[in-house]
From Swiss-Prot:
The active site is at residue 176. The modification Phosphoserine is found at residues 219, 369, 456, 460. Residues 58-313 form the Protein kinase domain. Gene3D superfamilies: Phosphorylase Kinase, domain 1, Transferase(Phosphotransferase) domain 1. This is Dual specificity testis-specific protein kinase 2. GO terms for molecular function: ATP binding; metal ion binding; protein serine kinase activity; protein serine/threonine kinase activity; protein serine/threonine/tyrosine kinase activity; protein tyrosine kinase activity. Its cofactor is Mg(2+); Mn(2+). It comes from Rattus norvegicus. ATP binds at residues 64-72, 87. Pfam families: PK_Tyr_Ser-Thr. The gene is Tesk2. Dual specificity protein kinase activity catalyzing autophosphorylation and phosphorylation of exogenous substrates on both serine/threonine and tyrosine residues. Phosphorylates cofilin at 'Ser-3'. May play an important role in spermatogenesis. Belongs to the protein kinase superfamily. TKL Ser/Thr protein kinase family. InterPro entries: Actin_reg-Ser/Thr_kinase (IPR050940), Kinase-like_dom_sf (IPR011009), Prot_kinase_dom (IPR000719), Protein_kinase_ATP_BS (IPR017441), Ser-Thr/Tyr_kinase_cat_dom (IPR001245), Tyr_kinase_AS (IPR008266). Residues 513-570 are annotated as: Disordered.
């Protein structure tokens, strides 16, 4: 589908058609739109946009998966027949992360990033509609009995790398990169991978200005050691997570330390793992070890990873062509010996020549060649200063460092945090053009204590509401009336179309680069002198403190709050 039409589902006009109406249309000065101010025509446009959101009743649905925060359905629009995926939030305390994820996905445009299609309303909550990916996730593919040659595996690794390279280029890193969050698409061209689930994504910290230390978030088996130790971390944490995914791809095993050997300091046990890789290309294994380096500074960037994988793919394809050329004369000779020129049919014809999926034990194998293609371990250069191999002479038992720490619960948890003010602001206050001011304290109640805290979820999605004492705890953080609190908690910025803007040097540094997808969708930058709608929250808080706030416009749907002047006066 054309990305410019992704918000046109279920009767939605394309975003380009709604742009002029949102920016003011015929009311006031069309060249200046201030943050926190909206003309009557703009307000009517917002009301119209909300009234035209699709309802869950507009779709037929089939559940295809579930996770810690949400359930995923394959849905078909009753009127248009369009097939999409619906991600329904199931955890009230994760609502802010879901809104942030929808905003971020709406700004991204890349073939290896899950495409955002629109929004669905159900029981007062917003849920994301995305493109439907037809072959599940990477973990499911690797756990299947399907034969995956090295060319396919390296191609999947390349797809994930270029998707993450694009994300990092935009100034954002994932923080929850796992094989579960890499979706697999299958078409006439074969397999391809798409990166999804950006609910924990964060702005890449700037070490030069001493950014706030980020919270511990993610899925423990894939989390970088520095994250697990609650140390400062950056986008190189994604590279370590990617390295664990490469281990899964190479050995076709789970990331669980019961299968994937780890060290006591949460690193990869290189020596033990290289006995599990079969005939893996040595340069592919070397890249995997580089990504899993305990020292973040020694890990490659995704741009470098992509270039390396391109070279590996090119070499593997050349070797495959050469092998086919050598097999052609042999096959031709066999056909000539068969009466009537019929092709020989044998068991060998049905078994792949080489299946790069050896296992420690035969019962884990998925084909005959898995059993008999084991090769002796090769020598790989390990440049990890923190690597502590197990002593094979003393038969040291396999290590599961995630069982040694009580807070990690054996790795069967997921850590999450409220969105920080440095990534994408979730507060959108529209001021009515009337007299009178309202203080910030009167309009907004705190979401959480000043210090940011990380939280963990139990391993079983079915156990969420019973085992999470903090579910719904945000509703009790304030003594205000529940209706008012719920409307103020999850106010969202930029439900209307996103636009580029002429940012100052400071705001340009804070804001995420999203010019390419917007230009692709037909948007143009604002005229000079206009204020951005999507600046960093820290900058917007300064603006709010410097100028008096007018009565907020109130319109509440799915936890999104806009408050009208008439309601305030009444």
């Amino acid at each position: 589908m054309d990305r410019s039409k992704r918000n046109s589902i279920a009767g939605f006009p394309p975003r380009v058609e709604r742009l002029e109406e949102f920016e003011g249309g015929g009311g006031g000065d069309g060249n200046t739109v201030q943050v926190g101010r909206v003309s009557s025509s703009s307000y009517r446009a917002i009301i119209s946009a909300f009234s035209r959101l699709t309802s869950l009743d507009d779709f037929t649905r089939e559940k295809i998966g579930s996770g810690f925060f949400s359930e995923v359905f394959k849905v078909r629009h009753r009127a248009s027949g369009q097939v999409m995926a619906l991600k329904m939030n199931t955890l009230s305390s994760n609502r802010a992360n879901l809104l942030k994820e929808m905003q971020l996905m709406n700004r991204l445009s890349h073939p290896n990033i899950l495409r955002f299609m629109g929004v669905c309303v159900h029981q007062g909550q917003l849920h994301a509609l995305t493109e439907y990916i037809n072959s599940g996730n990477l973990e499911q593919l690797l756990d299947s009995n399907l034969y995956l040659p090295w060319t396919v595996r390296v191609k999947l690794a390349y797809d994930i790398a270029v998707g993450l390279s694009y994300l990092h280029f935009k100034g954002i890193f994932h923080r929850d990169l796992t094989s579960k969050n890499c979706l697999i698409k299958r078409d006439e061209n074969g397999y391809s991978a798409v990166v999804a689930d950006f609910g924990l994504a964060e702005k890449i910290p700037d070490a030069s200005i001493g950014s706030e230390k980020l919270a511990v978030v993610g899925s423990p088996f894939w989390m970088a050691p520095e994250v697990l130790r609650d140390e400062p971390y950056n986008e190189k944490a994604d590279v370590f997570s990617y390295g664990i995914i490469l281990c899964e791809i190479i050995a076709r095993i789970q990331a669980d330390p019961d299968y994937l050997p780890r060290t006591e300091n949460f690193g990869l046990d290189y020596d033990a793992f290289q006995h599990m890789v079969g005939d893996c290309p040595s340069d592919f294994l070397q890249l995997t070890f580089n990504c899993c380096n305990m020292d973040p500074k020694l890990r490659p960037s995704f741009e470098e990873i992509g270039k390396t994988l391109e070279e590996i793919m090119s070499r593997l394809q050349e070797e495959e062509l050469e092998r086919d050329r050598k097999l052609q004369p042999t096959a031709k000779g066999l056909l000539e010996k068969v009466p009537g020129g019929k092709r020989l049919s044998s068991l060998d014809d049905k078994i792949p020549h080489k299946s790069p999926r050896p296992r420690r034990t035969i019962w884990l194998s998925r084909s005959q060649s898995d059993i008999f293609s084991r090769k002796p371990p090769r020598t790989v250069n390990v440049l990890d200063p923190y690597y502590q191999p197990r002593d094979g002479a003393t038969h040291t038992p396999k290590v599961n460092p995630f069982s040694a720490r009580q807070d990690l619960k054996g790795g069967k948890v997921k850590f999450f945090d409220l969105p920080s003010k440095s990534v994408i602001s979730l507060v959108f206050d529209l001021d009515a053009p009337g007299p009178g001011t309202v203080s910030l304290a009167d309009c907004q109640e705190p979401l959480a204590p000043s210090s940011r805290r990380w939280r963990s979820l139990p391993g079983s999605p079915e156990f969420l509401h019973q085992a999470c004492p903090f579910v719904g705890c945000e509703e009790s953080l304030s003594d205000g009336p529940p209706p008012r609190l719920s409307s103020l908690k999850y106010r969202v910025r930029e439900i209307p179309p996103f636009r580029t803007s002429a940012l100052s040097a400071t705001s340009a540094h804070e804001a995420m680069d999203c010019s390419n997808p917007q230009e692709e969708n037909g948007f143009v930058p604002r005229p000079k002198g206009t204020s951005p709608c999507s600046g960093a929250a820290s900058e917007e808080m300064e603006v709010e403190e410097e100028r008096p706030r007018r009565a907020p416009v109130h319109f509440s749907i799915s936890g999104i709050s806009l408050q009208t002047q008439g309601e305030q006066d009444g």
